[in-house]
Amino acid sequence: MSTSELVFIPSPGAGHLPPTVELAKLLLHRDQRLSVTIIVMNLWLGPKHNTEARPCVPSLRFVDIPCDESTMALISPNTFISAFVEHHKPRVRDIVRGIIESDSVRLAGFVLDMFCMPMSDVANEFGVPSYNYFTSGAATLGLMFHLQWKRDHEGYDATELKNSDTELSVPSYVNPVPAKVLPEVVLDKEGGSKMFLDLAERIRESKGIIVNSCQAIERHALEYLSSNNNGIPPVFPVGPILNLENKKDDAKTDEIMRWLNEQPESSVVFLCFGSMGSFNEKQVKEIAVAIERSGHRFLWSLRRPTPKEKIEFPKEYENLEEVLPEGFLKRTSSIGKVIGWAPQMAVLSHPSVGGFVSHCGWNSTLESMWCGVPMAAWPLYAEQTLNAFLLVVELGLAAEIRMDYRTDTKAGYDGGMEVTVEEIEDGIRKLMSDGEIRNKVKDVKEKSRAAVVEGGSSYASIGKFIEHVSNVTI
């Protein structure tokens, strides 16, 4: 039986490897003629990729490119990732050449994360097609294509939207999109906007786009992307792709789960802001006061921010009392628990959790929908503001805390100023009391789960992608 080899290259960073691994596992399960090599480009910041994200699966292997500290010299906030990927092209070329020379497989193509699309140059050298694996939402992809087309055909400069109250008509959204929820990189005049839209052009030039979404969540955006009159390659919505295995088994996780077991059903507000999420001391105190005022039970994942001069992951607090209001832990001990790192999927899956205050990262959004837990939107960076807009305005699946919040105010908005006690408290109260949001999320839960099983739209889309890989020529 001949084997077709796919080379996956995820972007560096904690959130990119797991969905890549899950997609690879899904493809291998569906077609035993496939094999996958995942090339991991390691960053020098923070811990290495968790080994839990690397299962022992037949026909799946990982090749690490060691951390190269010389890449620290490439730092520029909005263009670093592009330079980082370019820097790794020679190593990727050597790895792929080794695969071809040592294995009796047919190299079928590259599957590239958005920021890794320049690696399509390497794929072209080997005469194989490139596919994009878009791990954010379909609506965001549509916005990228829209702004890229306007730049290339109309000379449109998206950076002029900085500080603007303009609303944009974007085909992948039903409602006008406020400029204030655009990702900061779109507004960056120092190379970030150009890099972002150049990546959109690269994606448009690919042979196909795998999107971690589904009709149940983003029907409108997916219909636009698949309308066949916009110069966009075939789109394969295969989501939600999630790691549903809660393998973490340690004393801290056990303690968290025991505490949740003692809480009434749907009574707990879970606050968690992703692998890079943290706040300054003033904002932490505002959150604490809001939680206490709301009176709701809570589980709060609280991380220490890193110094501004360093680029690394947030750390654990050694003493929570140093950052929380005096007496907070004692006063709330009967209804709440403050933790460091959180086993997010295990928490969201627990029946006692009734709401999720989230940064709206796409992985977290999909996990929340899968578990049927309503969200309160508090985005921090990247495309999370767009995700918040999608959830709050487009779909009605989330309450708003502050949709246009940014941790970095370089783009010129005041969205990075502290969110007030009142905003947070109002968001939590709406999150836990709005029956309409809860019912909508329950409906999406059922439909998104149906999408990935046999007979579902995403299940069918995976099959179409495998067929495409088998037949496509560059």
Swiss-Prot record:
Top-rank taxon: Eukaryota
CDD domains according to UniProt: GT1_Gtf-like
Keyword Cytoplasm recorded: no
Assigned EC number: 2.4.1.-
Keywords, comma-separated and alphabetical: Glycosyltransferase, Transferase
Pfam families hit by this protein: UDPGT
Single GO molecular function: UDP-glucosyltransferase activity
Family in the record: Belongs to the UDP-glycosyltransferase family.
General function of this protein: May glycosylate diterpenes or flavonols in leaves.
UniProt protein name: UDP-glycosyltransferase 71E1
Gene name of the record: UGT71E1
